[in-house]
């Protein structure tokens, strides 16, 4: 287990004084435990396995379970695209998986 933190980039819509709407990214930092992912071998027909995948386990997030976001940052500031955000029924913790957002 590697104790770490992740910063979720939650996009919210804010109304301006003139009535216009603007999307604002609100960072939410949460404690997490980084899990190891074994990279699968390359398939001869596809390039699956080349990207950098990460998996985090978050505990006790409460009402933040229903957050809608597409990107998150790790403790080093590297941006990841969210691929999985679901509750693990075995231990009641949230699983967050992502792929490096700037490519391979």
Swiss-Prot record:
Cellular component terms per the entry's GO annotation: virion component
Biological process, per Gene Ontology? symbiont genome ejection through host cell envelope, long flexible tail mechanism
Q: Which UniProt keywords apply?
A: Viral capsid assembly, Viral genome ejection through host cell envelope, Viral long flexible tail ejection system, Viral penetration into host cytoplasm, Viral release from host cell, Virion, Virus entry into host cell
Compartments, as annotated in UniProt: Virion
| Domain of life of the native organism | Viruses
Task: Please state the protein's primary subcellular location.
Answer: virion
Its function, per the record, reads: Probable head completion protein that exhibits an open central channel for viral DNA ejection. Part of the head-tail connector by binding to the portal protein and to the head completion protein 2. Plays a role in morphogenesis of the virion capsid after genome packaging.
Q: Which family does it belong to?
A: Belongs to the skunalikevirus head completion protein 1 family.
Protein name, entry field: Probable head completion protein 1
- In which organism is this protein found? Lactococcus phage SK1 (Lactococcus lactis bacteriophage SK1)
């Amino acid at each position: 287990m590697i104790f770490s933190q992740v910063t979720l980039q939650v996009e919210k819509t804010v109304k301006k004084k003139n009535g216009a709407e603007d999307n604002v990214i609100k960072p939410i930092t949460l404690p997490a435990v980084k899990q190891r992912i074994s990279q699968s071998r390359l398939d001869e027909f596809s390039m699956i396995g080349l990207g950098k995948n990460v998996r985090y386990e978050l505990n006790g997030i409460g009402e933040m379970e229903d957050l809608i976001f597409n990107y998150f940052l790790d403790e080093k500031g590297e941006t990841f695209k969210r691929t999985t955000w679901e509750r693990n029924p075995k231990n009641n913790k949230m699983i967050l998986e992502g792929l490096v957002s700037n490519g391979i």
